[in-house]
Amino acid sequence: AWSGVWSGTLDIYGGKGKVQSVGMEIEILKIDTSTQGRYTFSLIYGGRDKDYRPYELVPVDASKGLWRVDEKNTIVMESYLYGPKLLCWFVVEGSRILCSYEKTDDRTLIFEVVSGRETPVSVTGNTKTDKEDISEVKTFPVSVFQRAVLKRK
């Protein structure tokens, strides 16, 4: 089960290595009053008094792995539970962001974020040779990578 309070350190990396570390918790708790199977999905950075994000995790079609993260401020993002990973991929203010939450065992949850500008850094391919049509490939920059290994409290 994913339910529980998960705690650890979030490490933030750039091209030159680790740039910052901050304490992090994720609270995933069933909402007692919910008949829809909703859960709290709170992200806490540096303590509840510093950066507390009281989101909710809402099932849409759990049999197909479709959920939504409701930020409770009109932002609602589709998320996908595929195998051991919950994935959410979105664009905000020109940055493309992929968040993943991976339950590796009953006591460990790995949280990762990859982000970078939505503008490609290169476009290659898009040509023909004697033997094949080469598809166009756009490569996007990665500016920040974040990772936390969280343990169940």
What are these regions (language model features)?
Residues 64-153:
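Beta-sheet ligand-binding and adhesion/scaffold domains
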Residues 4-8, 37-39, 107-113:
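A short hydrophobic beta-strand element
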Residues 10-12, 45, 115:
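Short beta-strand segments enriched in hydrophobic/aromatic residues
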Residues 7-38, 136-153:
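Short, solvent-exposed loop/hinge segments that bridge or flank secondary-structure elements
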Residues 1-5, 32, 100-104:
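N-terminal helix-cap/turn-to-beta initiation motif at the start of protein domains
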Residues 16-99:
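Central antiparallel beta-sheet cores of small beta-barrel/beta-sandwich binding domains
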